[in-house]
Design a protein with these regions (language model features):
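Gly/Ser/Thr-enriched, mixed-charge loops and adjacent short helices
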Residues: 2-4, 91-190
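Glycine-rich phosphate/diphosphate-binding loops that line cofactor/substrate pockets in enzymes
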Residues: 9-27, 151-160
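Short, highly selective alpha-helical patches that border small-molecule cofactor pockets
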Residues: 10, 36, 40, 44, ...
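Ferredoxin-reductase
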Residues: 21-98, 189-193
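Buried hydrophobic positions in well-ordered alpha/beta secondary-structure cores of metabolic enzymes
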Residues: 29, 66, 79, 148, ...
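Active-site phosphate-binding/coordination module
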Residues: 65-124, 195-214, 230
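Phosphate-binding and adjacent anionic-ligand microenvironments
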Residues: 191-192, 196-258
Length: 258
């Protein structure tokens, strides 16, 4: 489901999206760590020079923010550059059926991108624009927090079951979300511990995975577009059609095991 993040990948995606959309396309570019910024910016330059329009995420953020932005700005796709050197590729807008808008590209679609990459030649010869791309505003982060809080509040009509939690999450977004939901965050003596991978897609808790899935049973989507596996949960498919550990962790803290 991933590909090596490289300038050639951006060129291949540009070719793929141009063919899918029949013209100028919009691509969001997100990245996991500050060290990935230069590659993301180079990707934006390649996209602009290849007939597309690039929108860079405002800073290093978890992947669910990039997936969320695809739907919010009706982009035709997104690339998320991971710290591992791999890239997640999302499709949306005119490039995919509406039921899969904002979901990860299927293997068949990635194969077409691979073929486009193979036809691009060498990296040094790729055209690059000197500008033209935009930045996604910080307001997108607030919109994501608002949407998650609204979704979680809708899951528990009789009032939340709050528990003190401890949090390990690099971006700080989970703490912001928990504070919005009035969930106490503590350093010691927590009833529940929540740990999220830097890319924001995998949740590890002090509970076994089976108990997490039971607690989130009414929240989890059954959409075939969403990846499954230990630690991968999607609780808001209307906006993030991918594993979203941030939203899932906050939902677990509110819903508990009741």
């Amino acid at each position: 489901m991933t590909r090596c993040a490289s300038p050639l990948l951006f060129a291949g995606i540009a070719s793929f999206l141009s063919a899918r959309t029949g013209g100028r396309f919009r691509l969001i570019i997100g990245y996991e760590t500050p060290e990935n910024h230069d590659l993301a910016r180079d990707g934006a330059a390649i996209i602009e020079a290849s007939g597309g329009h690039a929108l860079l995420m405002p800073r290093a953020l978890p992947a669910p923010l990039t997936a969320f932005s695809v739907r919010m700005v009706m982009a035709d796709g997104a690339v998320y550059v991971s710290a591992s050197g791999e890239a997640l590729v999302y499709l949306g807008g005119r490039a995919v059926d509406r039921s899969r808008e904002g979901a990860l590209a299927l293997e068949a679609e990635l194969t077409l991108i691979d073929e486009a990459v193979a036809a691009c030649g060498d990296e040094a010869s790729l055209p690059r624009s000197q500008g033209g791309w935009e930045s996604v505003g910080d307001g997108m982060i607030g919109a994501y927090v608002d949407r998650c809080a609204s979704r979680i509040a809708s899951l528990e009509a009789s009032g939340p079951h709050l528990a003190s939690v401890s949090v390990t999450e690099a971006s700080g977004l989970l703490t912001i979300l928990l504070e919005r939901l009035s969930v106490p965050v503590v350093e010691e003596g927590a009833a529940l511990s929540l740990s999220i991978s830097t890319d924001g897609r995998t949740l590890t808790t002090s509970l076994p995975d089976e108990r997490v899935r039971t607690a989130l049973a009414d929240a989890l989507t059954t959409s075939p577009a969403v990846p499954t596996g230990t630690g991968l949960y999607c609780v808001d498919p209307a906006f993030v059609l991918d594993a979203d550990a941030l939203c899932a962790a906050a939902a677990l803290a509110v819903l508990g095991e009741s």
